[in-house]
């Protein structure tokens, strides 16, 4: 892995990536944490940092050197609403990438963070190697009222920006695959309900790849934090579960779906993915589920464990079914 003997602080302090460095993990000041002074080799021993972070940072440097990589939507769409939402552009070197859907990548973080460091840049680098252009979305978190509605607006703003700049990015703006992790996995699923693409008159994704996603409010039977529910949904959880926030009950608008998770997930019950898969099967929507025997929550690119290479398998599956679509 590149930079394995460099500290995280030195790598994120590189002036080339100054606009994005503070959002390596949005809403966390990493410079105040012990991991700031750890090398990437040392970080790999910690579960949530086990992926190929060095490859992601190397690819980020390469993108930054082009000068055509970082797009704060508050600036580019001239919106009076200041949200801090932005996309980072990782183009693939594959000449056929222009003809393929781009990947719209949404890292997770429990709706309080956005983990670009592990679930954004390294994953985008892998999709680039598979011949796909990638946009990485950094979205609003820590909302106090209807955050998920705001996140759907984040999606719409980003996708409209991309569609409006097809020539600049050498792609077809109406052809895209969504991929999201954990909370980001919930968002890419929610985008396929009536709250998502249809509400914004935007095209349906070609496919969706949720990775260890939350999908169901009814599965979360623990004690409810009313402030959290109001911040996410604008209502209490029981009321939200009667709406399309309960994704398996509103799955008719989904594209083909490939789900990836680990059996030993300690944070998100694997039943979230299985429940969605059963709902898609009832709708006769193509779906596969890959459940790793190990890896837990937050395995990201799956390096060093049984989930390694899942991005390639997702693409291979998508290409196998797209030939028949």
What are these regions (language model features)?
Residues 115-122, 135-173, 302-309:
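Catalytic nucleophile-loop/oxyanion-hole region of alpha/beta-hydrolase
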Residues 213-249:
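Mobile cap/lid helix-loop segments that gate and shape the active-site cleft of serine hydrolases
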Residues 217, 264-268:
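Acidic catalytic loop of the alpha/beta-hydrolase fold
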Residues 253, 259-261, 265:
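Short beta-strand/loop motif that positions the catalytic acidic residue
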């Amino acid at each position: 892995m590149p930079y394995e003997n460099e500290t995280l602080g030195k790598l994120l302090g590189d002036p080339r990536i100054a606009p994005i460095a503070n959002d390596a993990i949005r809403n966390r000041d990493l410079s105040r944490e012990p991991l700031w002074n750890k090398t990437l080799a040392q970080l790999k021993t910690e579960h949530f940092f086990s992926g190929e972070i060095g490859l992601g940072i190397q690819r980020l440097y390469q993108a930054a050197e082009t000068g055509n990589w970082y797009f704060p939507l508050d600036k580019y769409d001239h919106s009076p609403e200041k949200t801090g939402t932005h996309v980072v552009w990782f183009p693939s070197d594959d000449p056929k990438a222009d003809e393929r859907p781009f990947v719209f990548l949404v890292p997770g973080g429990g709706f309080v963070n956005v983990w670009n460091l592990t679930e954004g840049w390294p994953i985008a680098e892998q999709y680039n190697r598979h011949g796909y252009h990638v946009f990485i979305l950094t979205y609003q978190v820590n909302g106090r009222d209807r955050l998920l509605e705001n996140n759907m607006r984040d999606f719409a703003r980003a996708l409209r920006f991309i569609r409006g700049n097809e020539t600049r990015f050498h792609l077809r703006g109406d052809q895209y695959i969504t991929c999201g992790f954990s909370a980001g996995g919930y968002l890419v699923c929610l985008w396929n309900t009536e709250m998502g693409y249809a509400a914004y008159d935007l095209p349906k994704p070609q496919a969706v790849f949720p990775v260890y996603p939350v999908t169901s409010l009814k599965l979360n039977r623990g004690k409810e934090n009313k402030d959290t529910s109001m911040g996410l949904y604008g209502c209490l959880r029981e009321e939200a579960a009667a709406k399309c926030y309960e994704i398996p009950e509103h799955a008719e608008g989904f594209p083909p779906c490939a789900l990836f998770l680990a059996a030993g997930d300690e944070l998100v019950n694997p039943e979230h993915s299985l429940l969605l898969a059963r709902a898609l099967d009832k709708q006769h929507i193509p779906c596969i589920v890959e459940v790793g025997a190990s890896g837990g929550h937050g395995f990201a690119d799956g390096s060093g464990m049984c989930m390694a290479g899942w991005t390639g398998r997702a693409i291979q599956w998508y290409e196998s079914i797209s030939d028949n679509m």
